[in-house]
């Protein structure tokens, strides 16, 4: 099986504004790994994922990215960050929009696998809306 994707066309379909923290779309979704594009609209509170490693490649924009207890660092388009499951990470600020990531989660991450360091952060706004649901 194989797939071809027009990444720029998909990025162009993301809305200018959203009620959720991110809007995403799955490119592939297999038990061994999933790949997605997502646009960040608001800072993402400190959280981790229990079920997968994450590989984040910033396609467009600029964000302030924090991981574990390190000071936030600026990620710009063309940069990649990878980390293992249970690694606490956050986007503390969207510095340039649109901030769009290509991500690979291995194995597949179920959408509900977002464990906030501060559970109250889950109440700020919905975490994700799927592009196909808009």
What would you call each of these model-derived segments?
Residues 1-37, 45-46, 117-134:
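A short, N-terminal "cap"/entry segment at the start of jelly-roll beta-barrel domains
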Residues 26, 45-50, 67, 73-74, ...:
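Short histidine-centered beta-strand/loop micro-motifs
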Residues 31-32, 70, 96-97:
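Short strand-connecting beta-turns/loops that link adjacent beta-strands
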Residues 39-41, 49-65, 104-107:
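Short, conserved beta-strand element in jelly-roll/cupin
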Residues 69-85:
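Short acidic-glycine-tyrosine-enriched beta hairpin
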């Amino acid at each position: 099986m194989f797939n071809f994707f027009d990444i720029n066309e998909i990025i162009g379909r993301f809305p200018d504004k959203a009620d959720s923290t991110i809007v995403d779309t799955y490119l592939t979704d297999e038990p061994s790994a999933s790949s997605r594009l997502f646009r960040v609209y608001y800072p993402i509170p400190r959280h981790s994922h229990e079920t997968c490693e994450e590989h984040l490649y910033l396609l467009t924009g600029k964000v302030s990215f924090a991981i574990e207890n390190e000071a936030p660092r600026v990620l710009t388009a063309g940069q990649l960050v990878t980390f293992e499951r249970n690694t606490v990470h956050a986007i503390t600020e969207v510095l340039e929009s649109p901030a769009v990531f290509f991500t690979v989660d291995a194995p597949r991450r179920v959408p509900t696998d977002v464990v906030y360091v501060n559970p109250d952060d889950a109440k700020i706004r919905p975490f994700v809306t799927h592009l196909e649901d808009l």
